[in-house]
């Protein structure tokens, strides 16, 4: 919508001095601004500058708190009676005179806020876990006076849904905390200023008057008008919050420091007001590079100052914290917030979107050391400049802090070069698309239900529909598949029904006004489902098909263990016999999900992703027909089961790359660990070989999708074993797990052991 603001006014003319293009001035269109003004960079990293003394001093101050967190597995501090909002806290600083970019979630570094609107129970559990008492008035307010998202969901859940939740056939549902996975276009605040954005919402609100008076789609129209009003209110709150730090963000940013600061204030408002499971940053590096390059040309900024701006911005992202429970940590370990920033990629016009600022973002892993946040994600294309490819490979080899995603696949699929990644692997066009996050369904447990007639093998209660159990002495593949298909139908209904409830209630009681204010009015919504236990279910079905699997039953006839006679092909070795089973399961479940009605007509998608919940899923799932023992962790994401991918890196990568993105458009996570020696004896060879692996895995053409996502760890198992025994020697040791990075010291002992038990590829 065209915005009727006089952009010839001095405030806008000064801010946009030297910027090319006109469409983006008349209506909100950040992509158009970028395409007209960014400077592609095809050189190497030799221009980069070291950290300033201020950066080093500030980061050491932050690290003091992080060391306390690592040692205690507890927050440094948290509020006791303030319900956080965008404006709830006064300004907070690390050391104000040294900070080029300012702003904290609360009034002190690493102090955590209370987010009661998603649910009071998680906060109560946190108080109990960390030895504090909740203020009685605060508890009364959010129990009796102000209904929360969590209360709304559990008021409406069915008994079947509650049993699915208890058994672990559905796990990680966002029914007690913020759903997240929404990416505000935080760049809009820097480019346009708050006044421009507020005016757009006022015009859009007025535009609905006729529809309202005619009674057209009445409930949806009223809801949209209320949401637009909330957007306007949230934008003004962001302006008020920034004023506490001495900044007037009603106008556009006029220089690089203001552009970084304005953008960060927009993101800060999001993490002040929501505790979503994933609070992604978006695609900011090349946008900010435009301002930095303009300041370079004006002679008001040099390279070290530019790096300092980025360092201080990234430092603030590294400090974002939410108050979580130990139970949450068992699912999503190590305080992840998934502040995912995508870097690189190619434009639709064939130009690379790599800029010098792309290098600066990666360089923060040197200036301040490795860190899990922000979740730095390389959008990989075979056409990326070779110097950037090699630099990214070098950063991975040294820090194990990067993940890679297939730009050639997703750019083509979206027909957009302005998309980003929500959480770990979920692509969406920035400002035009949002996601209803849906956690994941346990396919391995579903297979056991298919064998046992819907009885849970751990709880010994009826969870699925009551059907005749499969009582053959040797499991018959066709019968098992028929039964599994029936139970997948049932699971899809329970899953989508639960998600419809969750997202209705989240919109009602914990709406993300500050994030949605930075979207177009009419957004494309997806309902993001997920699969866990894919490799367990796949190998189990392969064993049933190609070997002889005999159920071992308890006194009630329940299959509680399995005896395998013979060998069977295992997923992860580029064997079509078993890889085709994995592909079928992905396609089969997606088609069942897609057939069901969804809240707000969201388009169903699914991911193959577990985060660190692969450990909890293993705990909740009994012995499986592939020979996996009860309690043993699942493989993460789309990974082959630990130790079963025996034919080297290329075979394992090839198996995973076969999984159809067409039926898993919420992403397919693969975590790849390789010992340094397998990549080569010297650094130049290692970089070249890693670049070659990435090019091969992500290769995309008309008939070949290519892999979608790859975590890369380059390290020896022996180092991780030493880190368990001597954590003080490795304060910043960062590893990639399923879809994100985490400080190794922040994992539980069980999760550390799970990481160590995974395949470390010894050869290409």
Swiss-Prot record:
GO MF, one annotated term: formate C-acetyltransferase activity
SUPFAM superfamilies (UniProt xref): PFL-like glycyl radical enzymes (SSF51998)
Name of the protein this chain belongs to: PFL-like enzyme TdcE
Signal peptide boundaries: none
Catalytic machinery residues: 423 (s-acetylcysteine intermediate), 424 (cysteine radical intermediate)
Main location class: cytoplasm
InterPro entries: Auton_GlycylRad_Cofactor, Form_AcTrfase, Form_AcTrfase_GR_CS, Gly_radical, PFL_dom
Domain PFL intervals: 7-629
Induction annotation: Strongly repressed by glucose. Anaerobic growth of the pfl mutant in the presence of cAMP and L-threonine induced synthesis of TdcE.
Family according to the record: Belongs to the glycyl radical enzyme (GRE) family. PFL subfamily.
Gene transcribed to yield this protein: tdcE
Function: Catalyzes the cleavage of 2-ketobutyrate to propionyl-CoA and formate. It can also use pyruvate as substrate.
UniProt-annotated location(s): Cytoplasm
Annotated NCBIfam families: pyr_form_ly_1
A Gene Ontology cellular-component term: membrane
Enzyme Commission identifier(s): 2.3.1.-, 2.3.1.54
Record bears the keyword Transferase: yes
Domain (Glycine radical) ranges: 636-764
Effect of inactivating the gene: No discernible phenotype.
